[in-house]
Amino acid sequence: MESRLICLDTSIFVDYFRKKNKESTLLFQLADQRKAFSTTSITKFEVLRGATNAQQFFWETLFGRMEVLPFDDESANIAAAIFQKLKSQNKLIGIPDLLIASIAIQHKLPLATLNTREFQKVNELQLYSN
């Protein structure tokens, strides 16, 4: 059974912010379809670390309107197991992506991302397709 809640990766927010035509972005389309979405504390960090002071309000307002899922003990255990598996297969992905994937897996949520090349290496992760 597919979850109605979708977890959004950093790439979804960056794409929305960079594009002039907001309607062409997945974030806009999901909101327009009234899809429920969340994100992770890792994604929030990645977005906010690159934001200017002028952009901070926009991002804080947006993140305040959705559930931000934390990286906790359970997600740490999941991330460690995935890391070991990917390392043994010589298919390591970036640590932030690994942490984001572990949180989505923990909460049994599909992950919406524009970075499928990295995330598809994590077999346990369900990727969202529109």
Region annotations inferred by a language model:
Residues N90-I93:
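Donor nucleotide-sugar recognition loop
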Residues M1-T39, L48-G64:
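Short, well-structured N-terminal submotif of metal-dependent ribonuclease cores
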